[in-house]
Amino acid sequence: MTLAPARPTGPENPGPGPERPGPENPGPGSGPGPARPAPVLSVRDLRVSFPSEQGPVQAVRGVDFDLLPGRTLGIVGESGSGKSATALALMGLLPPAAHLEGRILLGGRDLAAMDDTRLARIRGKDIGMVFQDPMSALTPVLSVGRLLSQALRVHQDLSRKDAWEQAVQLLDLVGIPDPRERAKAFPHEFSGGMRQRVVIALAIANKPSVLVADEPTTALDVTVQAQILEVLRLAQRESGAALVLITHDLGVVAGHADDVAVMYAGRIVEHAGVDELFARPTMPYTARLLAAVPTAGSGVQRPLLPIAGEPPSPVALPAGCAFAPRCAVARDVCRTTEPDLTAPAGRPGRVACHRAQEIADGTLDPAGPAGSAVALTPDRAAARRTPGEVVLRVEDLVKTFPVTRGALLKRRTGTLHAVNGVGFEVRAGETLALVGESGSGKTTTLREVLRLRAPEGGRIEVAGTDVATLRSAAQVRELRSEVQIVLQDPTDALDPRLTVFDLLAEPLRAAGADRTAVRSRIPRLLDLVGLDRAVGDRFPAALSGGQRQRVGIARALAREPRLLVLDEPLSALDVSVQAEIVNLLVRLKRELALAYLVVAHDLAVVRYFSDRIAVMYLGHIVESGATEEIFARPRHPYTRALLSAVPLPDPQRERRRERIVLRGEQPSAARLPAGCVFVDRCPLHREADESVRTRCRTERPSTVGAPDGSDHRYACHAL
């Protein structure tokens, strides 16, 4: 078996996968039509709770849905909405302390009533799961071939030889190169994307009728994410399984789901076909969730509308509709009576909202009045009119690491070229985003900037000072105040033993500020990042993810830096919280004339709040320029592949646009090609004439400017 290559999708060439809802294939609640096939999985009144010191945590409250053969149900919602608890309940993987009620019917059998022994005979055979973290699903001391062989032999009467042959075929099916040899390798010898392919192979090994994928692409680059989603779709088609796809990425849902269930506070609040839900959401929560999503597919910079407030605690849910405290169109009845999940007249699908009929009739906007949410859009035109001074200048930056072998007596066997000749400038009031796959050198570049030491090669200048000229610790400390960092995970960045006040006071005290100065500065910092001053007395554990990230930003701003380095500042946040933080960063940049150097993998977010982009691959910048220029007219084939892999939260456009799926894995930076670093994966190289192909193999391309004279620059022989 071999992995079928990806192909463009469009009206004449529809993408793979099950049929979409339509007259002959109705979605949920679509009304009269041909009889639907019997569901392979039916969930009825599913309830999951966990004990806690404050009382029972109601994680899942009365969830109902049917999963049809060959179709994909996407489950979306904020953290804590009950998505993962639902997935674990389906698989029978809830912890022993959890309390489960309701029915989970698979082929007429109630999984909720089974003990672990009976469930073990069903898991992996009739229902398979793709986990978020592939390493948690793979035994590190067994080769991947042996893992697959064992999964096959547990449920089938196979000899070791036959099981091994089927394991090799499964690896081939999910796109593992040289599957017979790679079957002998161990999980740690695979990249993250390759490990996820192995997990998918495990999930489909026995051709289950149901697959459950819980955030299967969360930690992956966009190019690898696109590959994994294609593999998952192919696996579903090969096995004929129905798929439950749990994700926070609405673009992934738009491109791969047939039906969508939106969860909030432990229950489904809207359930409809994917086209209907994205085109005309009926539940106010769904409408606000979609309004908070940035999109990379359009040059129109609409404002992001974050959802006000925080999700309710599952220990103390409010009376009535759980979303009422955050809803812009809530009425008194919404605060006293919880609505049932019903189908409004004239609309497909089901929704739990007292005002659903008004929304369905078009007499009420589910997102509320235009002024009900504060939203900002970047003023790039103003930034171009008033360019600030250069805050950071990097020229020909080089960073290498030794490659060693041996446990005790290490010997050097090679050199890993992490960053090679990188150069850029960042001005006051400007955001430069470094984008690219993992291993491209983005984070190493950030670390070299933050070291404030002479680099291995090249030059780094911060606030007009060449870091190579710093001779004393006092000079370094003085320059350190000009550049600060906001880390990816605010939980890891904040000392859990300190209150917010002490966390913000720490950098001020380290700089020698007295008690009076500290006490006057901290309230202003909290105001600056939009936090109530009462938060100062709390510990990080008592804050939401968005609040913790705001504290991290306030801490970085404590000493009034000119440059903020942001390392994936949004990847650990829900989409609604992400919109709040994006809007905050845009406002702070404008008000304080800050310069931002950002590393991010979400190109939709990058498009929203960056002014310029530098695309990195294997330690080299292969293309750079103004954000809108890069998105509108990408030149380098790697940039084109990156942009084509970004999911769009629009089912029609997402399923019809052409994709460029890169072949193979990014090569090791310890063995760089002699010519272009992208040559082994470049689609243009495969189509070029022999003279260009020879140059690509033997000569490193120089960076050239676009013909229009703009600052758009790229390095490619084939253009």
Feature roles, as predicted:
Residues 53, 273-390, 404, 408-410, ...:
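Charged, flexible cofactor/metal-binding loops and thiol motifs
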Residues 78, 92, 212, 216, ...:
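P-loop NTP-binding/switch modules centered on Walker-like glycine-rich loops
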Residues 91-92, 450:
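Helix-to-loop junction immediately C-terminal to a conserved catalytic motif
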Residues 99-110, 458-469, 479:
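Conserved ABC transporter NBD signature motif
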Residues 110, 162-181, 290, 466, ...:
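Conserved ABC ATPase "signature" region
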Residues 111-128, 154, 160, 276-281, ...:
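ABC ATPase NBD coupling module
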Residues 207, 560:
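Conserved catalytic motifs of ABC-family nucleotide-binding domains
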